[in-house]
């Protein structure tokens, strides 16, 4: 049976992995004392600054997350940019 699991790959229990990720998120949030309100304000501040340099950012779609890396914790900001066809220049 282990041969078949190795051949086809056995998926990890998704609920256990989800619980692990949630626990890590809680621990990281607790370590840095960042409340949801502070994260929302950080997201708004990032959007404001980035719009000065990149007017095509989609501020509503910005995602800011804290995660645990191998050597250190990470603050990650995903900032979607509208393509030129999606956002015509102002004239």
Curated annotation (Swiss-Prot):
- Annotated InterPro entries: MinE, MinE_sf
List GO BP terms, alphabetically: division septum site selection; regulation of division septum assembly
Keyword Cell cycle included in the entry's annotation: yes
Q: Name one GO cellular component term.
A: plasma membrane
| Record flagged with keyword Methyltransferase | no
Which Gene3D superfamilies does the record cross-reference, listed alphabetically?
Cell division topological specificity factor MinE
Q: Which keywords does UniProt give here?
A: Cell cycle, Cell division
Its biological purpose is as follows: Prevents the cell division inhibition by proteins MinC and MinD at internal division sites while permitting inhibition at polar sites. This ensures cell division at the proper site by restricting the formation of a division septum at the midpoint of the long axis of the cell.
The record's comment on protein family reads:
Belongs to the MinE family.
Record-linked NCBIfam families? minE
- Name assigned to this protein: Cell division topological specificity factor
What organism is listed for this UniProt entry? Answer: Chloroflexus aurantiacus (strain ATCC 29366 / DSM 635 / J-10-fl)
Q: What is the lineage of its organism?
A: Bacteria, Bacillati, Chloroflexota, Chloroflexia, Chloroflexales
Q: Which gene encodes it?
A: minE
């Amino acid at each position: 049976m282990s041969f078949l699991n190795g051949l086809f790959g056995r998926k990890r229990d998704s609920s256990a992995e989800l619980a692990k990720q949630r626990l890590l998120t809680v621990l990281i949030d607790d370590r840095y004392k960042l409340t949801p309100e502070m994260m929302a304000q950080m997201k708004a501040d990032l959007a404001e600054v980035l719009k000065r340099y990149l007017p095509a950012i989609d501020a509503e779609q910005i995602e800011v997350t804290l995660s645990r890396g191998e050597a250190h914790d990470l603050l990650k900001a995903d900032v979607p940019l509208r393509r030129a066809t999606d956002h015509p220049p102002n004239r």
